């Protein structure tokens, strides 16, 4: 009786295991939030965050940086020609409306009513549509905001904790421009370029300036100037942009600066460095956990040119917000004085 030979099983070559894509994830972001949290550092009732680093003595010293009396405006005009395009949160550019005009006056309409001739107007705008400060109520991590306050304390009436009004007499001190674009020998950094802590340190070294506790650090990427030169904002409002890498959060925490500002829409690099779709991860750490205020959409052209000319990259900065009760941000016109 013939014995049938057992068929040999064909060797099946296993496909190599797929490697998980490496990169920044929400889990990494939340871990960094916990690691760099300043909650409770200035007491359980604090609503100022790292603005607490600025002392009265610091302000006096900063005032001594005024040598020439030269003032640089760092705010954009509030008008219909701003950078908003509705891509993020439906923000629009300022709308200016007249309530009383010279046309009314010369037609004799006003005097019978109020006994004088005059003009009056109002503006309709999102608080963060142009050059602005973010309040510490602007960004949440989970269900909490700065210092552990519940996010639900920001309701239809505004921010009952961490509102912008708490900054009313705080936004003055030493300003430092870090012209990263110039350090990289570029008029404008490319969209998607992630500025590293090494870039920041080397820019400061090139400029001969030291970053100190309580400083307001202003980053120039050249993006805004490029848009203004072209007469086209393009995707500036929420699109791709050069900006700070997520990993600069450690630099910000360790330097103990009090404000971080930029000529871009959102300071951090876009597209973001996360691989799982976590949006604006740098914001998650900096505002609600470290407690640092953001100055966004700052106009830097003349200041950048002057600093390059005289080699002085430090100045007195005065940038108070509008005292908007329970506001989550405020339009501003910062002043750098040298």
Regions found by a protein language model. Give the residues of each.
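Active-/binding-site microenvironments in catalytic and ligand-binding cores
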Residues: 2-338
């Amino acid at each position: 009786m013939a014995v049938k030979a057992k068929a040999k099983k064909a060797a099946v070559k296993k496909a190599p295991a797929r490697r998980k894509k490496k990169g920044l994830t929400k889990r990494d972001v939340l871990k960094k939030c916990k690691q760099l949290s300043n909650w409770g550092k200035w007491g359980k009732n604090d609503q100022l965050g790292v603005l607490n680093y600025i002392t009265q003595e610091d302000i006096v010293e900063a005032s001594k940086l005024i040598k020439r009396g030269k003032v640089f405006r760092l705010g954009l005009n509030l008008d219909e020609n701003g950078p908003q395009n509705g891509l993020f949160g439906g923000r629009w550019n300022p709308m200016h409306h007249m309530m009383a005009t010279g046309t009314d006056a010369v037609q004799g309409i006003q005097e019978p009513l109020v006994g004088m001739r005059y003009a009056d107007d109002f503006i309709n705008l999102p608080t963060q549509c142009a050059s602005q400060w973010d309040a510490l109520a602007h960004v949440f991590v989970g269900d909490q905001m700065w210092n552990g306050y519940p996010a639900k304390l920001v309701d239809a009436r505004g921010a009952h904790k961490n509102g912008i009004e708490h900054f009313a007499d705080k936004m003055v001190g030493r300003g430092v421009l870090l012209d990263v674009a110039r350090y990289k020998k570029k008029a404008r950094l490319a969209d998607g370029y992630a500025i590293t802590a090494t870039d920041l340190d080397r820019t400061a070294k090139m400029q001969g300036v030291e970053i100190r506790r309580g400083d307001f650090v202003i980053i120039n990427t050249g993006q805004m100037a490029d848009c203004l030169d072209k007469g086209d904002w393009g995707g500036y409002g929420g699109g791709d942009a050069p900006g700070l890498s997520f990993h600069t959060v450690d630099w910000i925490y360790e330097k103990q600066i009090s404000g971080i500002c930029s000529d871009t829409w959102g300071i951090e690099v876009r597209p973001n460095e996360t691989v799982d779709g976590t949006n604006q991860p740098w914001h998650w750490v900096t505002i609600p956990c470290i407690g640092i205020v953001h100055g966004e959409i700052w106009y830097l052209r003349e200041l950048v040119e002057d600093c390059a000319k005289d080699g002085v990259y430090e100045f007195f900065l005065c940038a108070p917000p509008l005292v908007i009760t329970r506001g989550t941000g405020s339009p501003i016109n910062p002043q750098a004085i040298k």
